[in-house]
Amino acid sequence: MNTAILVLIINKNKKDFLSVSLKNDHTDFNLPGGKVEHNETYIQTGIREVKEETGLDVYNLHYLYKDLDNDFEVITYYTFEYQGDIHTRENHIVKWLPIYDLNKSKKWSKYNSMIYNKYIDLKL
């Protein structure tokens, strides 16, 4: 089974999250993340993918949600702890969006709605 890790990075005011545009559609945004590589833990994958896609270092990732879709597993973590400057060498845009925009992704609206609801349920 293939596994992908997403990381919900929430800013200090708890009102915005860091989003990454899709590589082939700069008008649609999602969470930073990607596939788990050989001999990598889920947390290591999340840290690596965030660094690659945003330039930020993230710390203290907490489990939020897991979904199975056919032969693909997607696990989402969240954190409020990050350091560094936003920059990317990949072909996408990185920007802060209001947390309520999380469920507006065109491609991932169902999954992101679940993430949004799980985050709201935490009452952080």
What label would you give each PLM region?
Residues 9-13, 22, 79-81:
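Active-site beta-strand termini and strand-to-loop segments that position acidic
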